[in-house]
């Protein structure tokens, strides 16, 4: 699994770097891929951690690629969006990702109301929001960011 921490300015201000540092300390063996992204576009829910599965797989609720779930830059399915995470949550976030069992972080998942509200939006200027590592120019160029 892959954990992607939203480290736009609001995510950083809300403590995303502290949470990521705590997870990385637990992840000394590299069992979980850890990354960052810029703005995810939901400031009021920060810090946010997106949990992705392996590329080419689908969440249990999807029968096919036509299921319409959000995917990461490499085609990974978004399995969970954890919101308002805190440093005290780092151990269970890490354990959930390392084991592949997300039941221990269900209380951190985005609410059905917030999810429904956000799914109605069509992002145009922010269409790659939450998918680009702000420290990797190649990630930006891969989505025609410099075109």
Where are these regions (language model features)?
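Feature of Fe-S/electron-transfer and energy-metabolism proteins
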Residues: 1-147
């Amino acid at each position: 699994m892959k954990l992607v921490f939203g480290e736009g300015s609001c995510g950083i201000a809300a403590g995303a770097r502290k949470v990521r540092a705590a997870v990385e300390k637990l992840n000394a063996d590299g069992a979980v891929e850890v990354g960052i992204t810029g703005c995810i576009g939901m400031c009021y829910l920060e810090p946010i951690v997106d949990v992705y599965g392996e590329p080419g797989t689908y969440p249990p609720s999807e029968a096919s690629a036509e299921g319409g779930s959000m995917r990461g830059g490499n085609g990974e399915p978004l399995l969970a969006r954890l919101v308002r995470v805190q440093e005290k949550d780092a151990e269970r976030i890490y354990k959930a990702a390392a084991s592949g069992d997300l039941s221990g972080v269900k209380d951190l998942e985005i609410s059905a109301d917030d999810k429904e509200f956000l799914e109605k939006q069509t992002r145009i200027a922010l269409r790659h929001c939450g998918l680009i590592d702000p420290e990797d120019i190649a990630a930006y160029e891969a989505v025609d960011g410099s075109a």
